A protein has these predicted regions:
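Conserved hydrophobic alpha-helix
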Residues: 85, 134-137
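Activation segment
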Residues: 41-42, 110, 160, 167-171
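Conserved structural core of kinase catalytic domains
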Residues: 47, 55-59, 68-86, 90-128
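Juxta-kinase regulatory segment immediately upstream of eukaryotic protein kinase catalytic domains
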Residues: 1-25, 229, 236-239, 243
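Conserved protein-kinase catalytic-loop segment immediately C-terminal to the catalytic Asp
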Residues: 148-155, 161
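Catalytic-loop of the protein kinase fold
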Residues: 139-149
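C-lobe/activation-segment region of protein kinase-like
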Residues: 155, 165-262
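ATP-binding glycine-rich loop module of kinase domains
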Residues: 22-73
């Protein structure tokens, strides 16, 4: 339990009134690096209505949006998710202080898995690291929120950490759907990088080996979610923009795996 008189709580109370952005990094008087997430504006409901419409017409159940009510509800959700995940052995930031208007938590590391996959020579090893870390979370009976590679930290001690828990998918979908959603977030954010680096075929082999360790239901849900997007795998020109090309690379990865090993 976080006590009101602990030094982190005092620091949070001092920081919140002067922090201009929703999320910011701070160095405390002790030299410790922390992050503060401040309550911000609610996200317009039309975003969820629009995204939900596309998810519905394509039957993308595992990709359907999770309501984010913004403001204090986000703070409460994030604090709760951090505590639950940490209690189940998932490497997430430790909650140091909380109030209705914000939370303070620890800094896991400087480099995201996205940066590592983009710039390191052994990008496939890093990619596999993300797959294994997501599976470990599920083996603990837990799920993540949006495990895009930018939200996965390559920690200095060699472990893998997760950040960004402002949504709780488990309130709106089954555990199996949460598992599928976690993988889809990760694959969608990384397949295009591996394709650009000429490593998509190798990634297909790794992904197939990984699917052999997963529940058949999860694998089926992932394939079903991507099936309506398979036509996009022929999109290559930059004029399509980053988001469509990410989906195109995801579709190509899943298609190649299914075609090669079905």
């Amino acid at each position: 339990m976080i006590m009101n008189n602990n030094p982190y709580q005092v620091a949070l109370a001092a920081i919140l009134p002067r922090q201009a952005t929703n999320i910011a990094r701070h160095t405390l008087a002790s030299g410790e690096t922390v992050w503060v997430r401040k309550a911000g504006k609610s996200i317009p409901q039309w975003r969820y209505t629009l995204i939900g419409y596309f998810a519905a017409i394509f039957h993308l159940n595992a990709l359907k949006p999770v309501p984010n009510h913004g403001d204090r509800a986000v703070i409460a959700t994030k604090a709760e998710r951090l505590q639950i995940l940490e209690a189940h052995g998932v490497h997430v930031p430790h909650l140091l202080a909380r109030s209705a208007d914000g939370i303070m938590f620890t800094h896991l590391g400087e480099h995201t898995l996205l940066e590592c996959i983009e710039h390191e020579t052994d990008d496939l090893t890093r990619w596999q690291q993300g797959l294994d870390a997501i599976r470990a979370v599920h083996e603990h009976g837990q799920y993540l929120s949006e495990p895009f590679a930018r939200n996965i930290i390559a920690c200095p001690d060699g472990s893998t950490g997760f950040i960004d828990f402002e949504e709780d998918p488990g309130q709106y979908m089954s555990f199996t759907a949460c598992e599928s959603r976690d993988y889809l977030c990760y694959l969608q954010s990384t397949a295009i990088i591996l394709k650009q680096r000429g490593h998509l075929d190798a990634a297909v082999r790794l992904w197939h080996a990984h699917t052999r360790t997963l529940s058949p239901t999860v694998v089926h849900d992932i394939q079903a979610a991507v099936r309506p997007l398979l036509w996009m795998r022929c999109l290559h020109h930059p004029r399509w923009g980053k988001d469509p090309l990410r989906l195109a690379a995801l579709a190509e990865l899943i298609h190649l795996e299914h075609r090669t090993y079905a």
